[in-house]
Amino acid sequence: MEPIVEQLKSRFDKALITAFGQDLVGTDPMIVSTTNPKFGDYQCNVAMSLAKKLKDKPKAIATQIINNLNINDYFYPPEIAGPGFINLSLKPEYIENCLETIIKDEKLNISPTKNPQRVVIDFSSPNIAKEMHVGHLRSTIIGDSLARVLEFQGHNVLRLNHVGDWGTQFGMLISYLREAFPEALKTADILDIGDLVAFYKQSKKRFDEDQDFQEKSRQEVVNLQTGAEDSRHAWELLCNQSRREFQVIYDLLDIKLNERGESFYNSMLPGIVEELNRLGLLEESDGAQCVFLSGFTNKEGEDVPLIVKKSDGGYNYATTDLAALVHRIEKEGATRLIYVTDAGQANHFSQVWQVAKKAGWIPENVEIVNVFFGLVLGEDGKKLKTRSGETVRLIDLLDEAINKARNDLEKRLKDEKRLESEEFIKNVAQVVGLSAVKYADLSQNRKSNYVFSFDKMLALQGNTAPYLLYAYVRVQGISRKGEINFEKLRKDAKIILQDEPELVLGKHLLKLNEVLNIVTIELLPNRLCEYLYELSEKFNKFFENCPVLKSEEPLRTSRLLLCDLTARTLKLGLYLLGISVLERM
């Protein structure tokens, strides 16, 4: 089913053209959902914006629009409010019919997009030989959620993990391990990621202090680049060890990714530089090959170039990012590229994309978006750190979330005098703990910093994952208590919206498709979180004010179906956020 707001736009388009002529073809009718029910369910704000063009008063324009508008099949007669707002209220019988259609459809009557795209999403992207930290949390779960929504909408999505698996650091680390711990370069089973991080720090210190070691490290990089067997073997061991550690976290968070690290693009780098040179875009600066761009300056106001080939002949991140961009467009056929990175990288990618545009590598039909995000802060308002001032390891954060969720659950079970199996406790604690972390992040506008608080994110009240999960669990409890077979009820669904709380709930259930379209365009998962939180609130109000199991037929079945549709909508919405539901909590 097409979202109501889209249906309205189509009807208003016709009304505008009929009333004012072909000059208004393509005019945005400015239809929005209202935030206050006293203004109806939807509002058209176009009359004010047309006043100057049509040389008439907004109210007069609004009247002409209404006189040519055909929406009587599902709206009450429109009302003009204020200077020229057109307020629209849905008819209950239309809402009932729509809900009945949605209930009978497995995908909640959400049709795939009419214009599927090849979308590449670059997210997570940790560095080999370094542990994933709290900063990787945002990129990983925001990218995963956007991928899920776009896939559900029918787009062809390629999820890419652009891991940092190449560069000088490998020369340093391999050289250091050859001296300090040669056994580590024979098998990937000897070291864990924590050992690699420690060795990396030691190798960096040695590199900064010892010129001979610097030369060895640089030679090791040359050996890697030329394919020396022992160097490549050592590099592959380090990569495999890191991959195993990363996969533990990806499995825990249920993240699916295709690894395509920096090394994948190595063979393409000379060609990128040669083409930029052929196009006359390269300039030499301090021995390096650069592209100078307008609008990028340092603190002194001097132009800052994008370096694509260093003075020592090596390439850097920018060259690799250009090669990746070209490959994703030319070989993968991407028409939408989404980079999920922290806000600190926005300037770098702006430079890369500007160079690519100047080179003619970005066709007009290709959209490139930097989905940037803010910092995770501690409760002191500063960047989240451990007590010793270290960066928080992501695995430690997730483990702590699960442990805290378990403690809360065990306390609640004790208070309720409930006995549950160890398997039940372990499963609920893991789902609630991980869901709380994901939802606390995704429910924030990704562009903002947010304060990380276990107490807030694990609360059973408020805009939290446990609150949403509990609303789902509540419906499952109704099903068990009344021995209800929802699948059977759905076949002959008949909805009756008798009382205000069920009417409000019914209207909200119709808006999922509209919200998913907004997420697809704006790439803001918090829009979906807001919808699901409001759904849970409206459901709880309905449940508290409208008897379900004790109602007489046919109202009883209608209300049961509203409960079922709420649960199905919550389950789908939470899945699109990367969150699993529970039958009991």
Swiss-Prot record:
This is Arginine--tRNA ligase. GO terms for molecular function: arginine-tRNA ligase activity; ATP binding. Keywords: Aminoacyl-tRNA synthetase, ATP-binding, Cytoplasm, Ligase, Nucleotide-binding, Protein biosynthesis. GO terms for biological process: arginyl-tRNA aminoacylation. It is found in: Cytoplasm. SMART domains: Arg_tRNA_synt_N, DALR_1. GO terms for cellular component: cytoplasm. A motif ('HIGH' region) lies at residues 126-136. Transmembrane segments: none annotated. The gene is argS. It is an enzyme of class 6 (ligase). Its main location: cytoplasm. Its EC number is 6.1.1.19. It catalyses: tRNA(Arg) + L-arginine + ATP = L-arginyl-tRNA(Arg) + AMP + diphosphate. Monomer. It comes from Trichodesmium erythraeum (strain IMS101). Belongs to the class-I aminoacyl-tRNA synthetase family. The lineage of its organism: Bacteria, Bacillati, Cyanobacteriota, Cyanophyceae, Oscillatoriophycideae.
